[in-house]
Amino acid sequence: GNYVSKAGKNITKGDDTKDYRNSSGLLMGEDGGPEYLTVFNGETGAAMQTVDFDPPRSILTSSKWGDSYANRSERYLAAVAYLDGVHPSVVMTRGYYTYVYAAAYTWDGTDLKEQWLSTNTPTEENGGTGCTVKYADGTSKNNTNKTLYAQGAHSVSVADVDNDGYDEIIFGSAVLDHDGTVLTYDGRG
């Protein structure tokens, strides 16, 4: 609707007249339409800024998510964490049971900025690349032996589990460190 496509300082985002549902009524893949993350003013309800949601549902085909009806690709969790130990960040996750993506965003009162995107595939020994984190400055880190893949749960928690002064994201039996890398996982889901 208009409240999303013309939110905040963005002039126009998307086509608010197009119906993106498929013949089964589902929003799937590249044809599933755009997705957004919006910051609203808590006092007035006015949209302050809208950005494209990362990762988009089209990042994987439905079969890679583990089903063909958009159930796992449309599973979202959110948390607020102090990833730098001082300022709040929002961490948004997409996916359960198989592929998992997590993105951290900061809000400085004017701009909503992505800090990092953590992509989690099977570990290298299982034919994947493990955990890859891309940062806003264009750099990246990769750990082929640790992953959130198949470690999901129906909740996400936040705590400073390694006592370093920065919050970590607890995702089922795995822990994402404050920089988006996998701190630990037990491989049992």
Where are these predicted regions, by residue range?
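Beta-propeller-forming repeat regions
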Residues: G1-G189
